[in-house]
Structures are given as structure tokens and as C-alpha cells.
């Protein structure tokens, strides 16, 4: 068995080895070369020549002839070696061809391969899919392997782990300093005339990328297509199933909410952008990157974003500092008016793509709800943003009814409840605040807080003759930044009493039975039953009922007879007493345990 290094004449690319038994024929060698290079024509159409340097020596890889050969150029020596009379014949044995030559070694060229006429410069296949597969296999696998914030500037400028193959004509044309330059070219691309990434080239480096039709006096809207032609195209090309949205708060009346550009993997916004027209200072979108973000990414070191003002663009790592504040760390600046800077941004974005999966995999579930659209069965669309919640109604009637309810809540000063901050009658949209997280209490002390918050709201609500009617944990939401809860979704709220069938659409297993009694009516007492239901469906019902008086209180709350249930005022007073007693018992227990340890 012998290893022969082969080079294709007239085609840019690296040499390749072929292992073959010396007892085989040149025809077998042609077949092996065809299989290695996946050529789509018969093997016998290949022409093979020995790469002799003179005497019994082989062409050295260090010579100028071989260097030019790899670039697709034919030197006088290569032309002389590939004359027709020197072609190896298919029936010739390999051993006879090698007779009199030095034993083949590495750093040599042994066989020159000439392709059939008409195929010398034609690609055999598009290399885009193979490039993408290899590139994605280069992703950073673990969170601990992510570069530090301080190293990100160097990281985004490093050569790609898998270079993008370009045909010789494009490779040479883009080498101009006005387009790319050799240093940046060699970080992004490599010569490949056999299977260049034609689809990638045409998709990412399109005419819109190379020759942008926008100038420095254009509006922000005019720049959207330009920014997208780089950022959206690159990210979307690498991650085909990602969610990409832009300008999603423009139609909203609630001010700061969603970013101007949003890129999410598995529902997690790992990359975002804030954009302004050219005449705006870039400090404005830079500050919006941190102001619009409420950190929900747990312990990951950072996510990413950009600030753009016309052609000026800055890349940032966005992180949470030790005090809990969201900060930005500049990792790169670009003047996209110039072609080399646009290519440099592509390099930075592709390198950042290598980090996205590890970040997404280590985010908590809450990060996936930062931006989410929920479609209710009643036709209401709920749009979640970091700080706000939009509710878009299906009918004018429903929009007005819910708006009137929230207007009443505001007039009464109902505490511990969400509130409408802006309205859009044209879009049938109510924007509510705050935005919290759906999380049940994890301890008895937290349950006291949550129930107390609900009862504080009910005291004021009931005092003004209203009832919520749909209290359950999905409508009791925890604040993002503190251990307190608030009541949401007053769409089913009504004045007390209500006659059957009002409220009949509610679920029987989650609501008091008096709502569903034919011919009957229900009052604010249904909300007290619901407070008991919160205890029953909490994570710590057993701990609650371990105290007999608390267990009796739970029975009273959920008594089938509405008149036997306590009022919200009474329930809040009892809850406060239970909370004090539990705190005293906990304090006494700690004292006893401390004495035992001393003993």
C-alpha cells in the first residue's frame, strides 16, 4: 500500500491523499480519485500524470510551482508535466509508474489530475450544507467554556473554525482592500473550486450586502432593510428554526417594551437590537438595551445585543451585575458604510453564533416566557413583554367591558392587582402592568404573603360591591423582583350578586359550586372559597393543615354554604394572626435548637 498525494490541475484547492496498492492499475487509481472527490463523471475520463521535479525526485510542496498549483494556476513546469504524451495509461500497473522514483513521502505532490474538458472550473456540488453542518458542530458545548466578557472582543474577531469555501474568481475579487482585504478574507473564506458555498454566498453576501441602497440621510425605516440584510440574514442562515421579529412595539402605545429587533432560540431571546435613525446619538439605543431588559436568564454570564444609529453599530454583551442591575459591555464597533466593516460584522456574528446554544441550554424556563404570544380560547391574544402585558381583544364589546372593569379598579384604588397603563381603541388593546412570573409560594411564610396580598385586594374590591370570580394560581402572579404576589385577569369580574347563568362558563372543579346553581345567585363569597382553593392547590397544604386552627379556617373558606364563609376583612385578620403565631413558633423552635447545640 502506498499513499499518493494528488493535486487537481487548474482548480484551486488543497491536495488530497489516496491510499492504493502498488499492484493495482492506474485505472484503479482513477476510480479511487473519483470516489474521494465525488466526481459525477466516469473515472476513465480523468487524466493522470506523474509530478516529477526532475530525475527521480517528486515536486516539493514548498516550491512556488506547487503553491501556484494550489491556487489554480498552471506554471510552465506543470504545463510540461501534463502534456498528452506523458499521460498515465489506465492499464499500467502503479508499481511500474513508480519505478525509478524516490519512495513517496509527505510534503510532496505525486500525481497531477486533469479533469475532463468543461469541468476544470465547474463546481461538482454546493458545499453550503456541509459547511453549515461542520460549523454547527464547532459550537461551544458547555457554559464553563464560554469566553469571559473581557475576552469577547478578541473572540468575535478570530478566524472561523470552518472557513466558507469560495470559487477562485470570487476569492480573488474580494481580496481587494476596498471589499475585504487579505487578512479579513483569510479569517472568513478559503479557496474551493470543487464545492464552494454558492448558496451561502448568494444568500448572505447578496447585492443588498455588497451594494447597499441607503445613505446617511435616510430614515430609520429605510435602514431596516439594510440592518436586516446583514444581521437577520446571518443569524437566520445559521439557525433556520429561530424566531426573528423586528419593530414589534412600534404599533403599541405602551412605550418601552419589546426591542426593535428580537432573535430567539427555543423561545429565549439570546440576541436583540435597538435602532435609531442616523442623526440620533448611538447612546440612545445603547441605553435602551439595558433599560428594556428585565433579567430572566438565571446564571448565564451574558446574552447579546446591538445598538445601531444609521451606519454606526455597536455589539454588546448584556449581563446582570452583582447588585441585580442590567449592564452592557461593549465588544465591538462597526462603521457599516464601508464594505470591509460589513464583512467584519459578519465574522463577529458568526462567531457569536457558536455561543448561543450553550447560553440557551443553561437558561431557566422563565427566560422562555420573556417574549411570548398566548392565544386564549375566547379570542383574546396576550402578548408578554419584560415589563408589560398586552391584551388584544377580538370584539369591541369585550374590549370596552374589560376596560370599564379596570377603570373601576383604578377608581377604587384596589391594591395588589395589575392595572391598565395605556389603551389603544383602534387596536382593541389594553396594556397592563406589572409583568410578573407564574410561581407558587415555596414555603409557609411565602404562602402567608401570597394569601395576604390576595385578601388585601379583595377587601377593597368587595367593599365596592365587586368580585373577581376567577382566583386560582394562574391568576395570582409573583412580582419579578420581590416576594409579593398580585391578582390579575379581571375579565370575569362582576358586581355582586350575580344570578345564574352568569359565570357558568367557568370550570366547575376550580370554582365555588354556588356559581353553577340553576335558579340561584352567587356573591363575593365565591372569592373566599377561591382563597381556600389556593391553599388546597399550593405546594404546602400539608404544612398549613398541620395546625388545627388553620385547618378549620380552610374548612370555613371552602364551606359549601356561602353564608358560612368569612368575609375578606375577617379572613385577612385571621390570616395575620396565623402568620404572627407561625413566626413566633419558628422563633421559639430556633431557640430550642440553639440550646441543644450548646449542650
Curated annotation (Swiss-Prot):
Sequence motif: Host nuclear localization signal, positions: 590-599
InterPro entries: Crinkler_N, Kinase-like_dom_sf
Positions of the UniProt region annotated as LQLFLAK domain: 18-52
Sequence motif HVLVXXP motif, location on chain: 110-116
Ranges for region Disordered: 577-599
Source domain of life: Eukaryota
Primary localisation category: secreted
Entry keyword Mitochondrion: no
Function: Secreted effector that induces cell death when expressed in host plants. Acts as a kinase and is able to autophosphorylate, however its cell death inducing ability is not a direct result of its kinase activity, but rather a consequence of the phosphorylated state of the five identified serine residues in the CRN8 protein.
Family membership: In the N-terminal section; belongs to the Crinkler effector family. In the C-terminal section; belongs to the protein kinase superfamily.
Designated name of the protein: Crinkler effector protein 8
Source organism per UniProt: Phytophthora infestans (Potato late blight agent)
Lineage, top ranks: Eukaryota, Sar, Stramenopiles, Oomycota, Peronosporales
